[in-house]
Regions:
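Surface-exposed amphipathic alpha-helices with a cationic face
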Residues: 37, 197-205, 330, 354-355
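Catalytic domains of carbohydrate-active enzymes, especially glycoside hydrolases
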Residues: 2, 27-52, 287-288
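Outer-envelope exported proteins of Gram-negative bacteria
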Residues: 47, 210-212, 216, 290, ...
């Protein structure tokens, strides 16, 4: 990361303001980039962009390579002439501008996207043909996977008919012919997703704003990745998992966390020169400027739980690939800007891996005052940082700063006030002080969720782990990111040496 000081904002694409029910690559996204630039910000951190499954979590995606069709701008398709404004306005996408109604989005968006595809004559587009060729290593399998999944009523691929579940050649040939137009529809949506995303990213980069992407260490069991590459995962001869991922019991959970993702066969990956991982990361760095890798400790040791267990109590630790993977990444791809998400209890060997990789790790100020901590709360206090880290007030999994301060114990609130040496401000004043604290820290990069700048409570929380129903829904309302707030953020960014000084393209002229 070097000695350059940066700051940025965390906001998922889905949380952008939008006319049609969910944040996407529409004009609102470009306006948000302009607002970030006016606020002196140099980074925009987002969440994974893959197509989401039934829980709507971007960390449980149908593909690690594909993009979420929800993010395709309908406004752009109207301008292309493949949809009309009247058609889009007639669809019920939900009534709340600060909330995503995923059921209505699912029903409405795909109908419109199918109309756009049918009118597009996409097979005659040379750019589409080029896209198919360039993305051949994943696109065909993904499109077939989604087409077959739709044919079988959306059930997981592990419940499909045996011939296609086990990818017998005659079954693959049959479904490729039988579902030709459905497959092309899936490929069309990916083409539009990547076409629109490339334009938005270029717009941001031109204004000095780098995109920080996010990838989970694991893929979902019900994904094109596991279906198309079963040999890379711990599956049996019927392609059922033998072990799944999670976290052991700790001070926060007596039964641990059962994530259910299939585990990697690291010996197979090593024997292939980590080819799948090289393709995955190369793909990510075509999409993003910086990549945050979730659960980085899993590359040192990962927690394996017998498949079928109801909790994580009977799991055990196994060794991951360690530096072998990242030496290969460096050799094949060159130096890349990676953030190692190393939150939680860290062993000495995990710390050594992060240090040897050279990647900046993460600091979350909310973790610095936790009485339940298992031993490394002081690591999150700013006086213990070095330059090679990224500091956050909170992540997508955390309470908002205001919600957090309201919910912690009186003893913890006293610890915060004592550290800030502030015994008189109200809760919002304390949150402003916390933002100043991390912005003024020695950390090379500082990322703050937009909700914390807005001083919003936990109604604006993005995700509460291990819960269902209310997650991934919050949206920024039109006008909330005000000119006044942008000016305040600009002053902070300038004062603490983090300002994005890139000239606007118009100013350069």
């Amino acid at each position: 990361m070097g000695n350059q000081r940066e700051c940025g904002v965390l906001l998922p694409i889905s949380s952008l303001p939008s006319k049609y029910g969910i944040g996407c690559f529409s004009k609102s996204a470009y306006e948000f980039v302009d607002q970030l630039k006016a606020a002196g910000q140099g980074c925009w951190q987002i969440l994974p962009l893959g197509p989401t499954s039934y829980g709507d979590s971007p960390y449980q995606s149908f593909s690690t390579f594909a993009g979420n069709p929800y993010f395709i701008s309908l406004e752009d398709l109207i301008e292309e002439g493949v949809l009309t404004k009247k058609e889009c306005d007639a669809v019920d996408f939900g009534s709340r501008e600060d909330d995503v109604d995923y059921e209505k989005i699912y029903k409405g968006r795909y109908k419109l996207l199918r109309k756009a595809y049918e009118r597009s004559e996409i097979s005659k587009n040379p750019d589409f043909v080029r896209f198919q060729q360039e993305q051949a290593h994943w696109l065909g399998d993904y499109a077939l996977f989604m087409a077959v999944k739709d044919r079988f009523g959306g059930i997981p691929w592990t419940e499909w008919a045996e011939d296609i579940r086990l990818r017998w050649n005659n079954a693959l040939d049959y479904y490729r012919k039988e579902l030709y137009f459905e497959i092309e529809f899936q490929e069309y949506m990916q083409f539009k997703f990547y076409e629109q995303w490339a334009k938005l990213k270029a717009y941001a980069n031109k204004r000095g704003i780098r995109i920080i992407g996010d990838i989970p260490i694991y893929v979902a069991m019900d994904s094109a990745d596991t279906w198309a590459n079963p040999g890379l995962f711990k599956l049996d001869e019927n392609n059922e998992p033998t072990q799944v991922a999670g976290c052991p019991p700790d001070g926060f959970s007596a039964t641990g966390q059962l994530w259910g993702n299939p585990l990697y066969r690291w010996d197979v990956h090593r024997n292939t020169g980590f080819e799948w991982w090289i393709k995955r990361l190369a793909h990510c760095f075509n999409m993003y400027d910086v990549v945050r890798i979730d659960h980085f400790r899993g590359f040192d040791e990962y927690y394996a739980i017998p498949y079928g267990d109801k909790d994580a109590k009977r799991g055990w630790w196994e060794k991951g690939p360690g530096m072998d993977l990242f030496r290969t990444v460096s050799y094949r791809l060159g130096h890349k800007d990676i953030i190692a998400e190393d939150l939680g209890f860290m062993t000495d060997s995990v710390k050594r891996l992060v240090e040897e990789s050279g990647y900046p790790n993460m600091k979350v100020i909310e973790f610095a005052f936790d009485e339940r901590d298992t031993g490394n709360a002081s690591d999150y206090l700013p006086h213990n940082y070095n330059n090679n880290c990224v500091v956050y007030t909170g992540t997508h999994d955390n309470e908002t700063l205001l919600g957090w301060f309201a919910d912690i114990t009186p003893e913890e609130r006293h610890m915060v006030r004592e550290y800030l040496w502030n015994f008189h401000d109200d809760e919002k004043g304390i949150c402003r002080n916390m933002i100043r604290l991390v912005m003024g820290s020695v950390a090379g990069r500082c990322i703050i969720p937009i909700q914390d700048y807005l001083l919003l409570d936990n109604k604006a929380r993005i995700n509460q782990p291990s819960t269902l129903g209310k997650n991934w829904k919050w949206r920024l309302k039109e006008g909330q990111f005000s000119n006044e707030l942008q000016k305040e953020m600009l002053i902070l960014a300038t004062r603490f040496g983090r300002r994005n000084w890139t000239l606007d393209p118009e100013e350069e002229k």
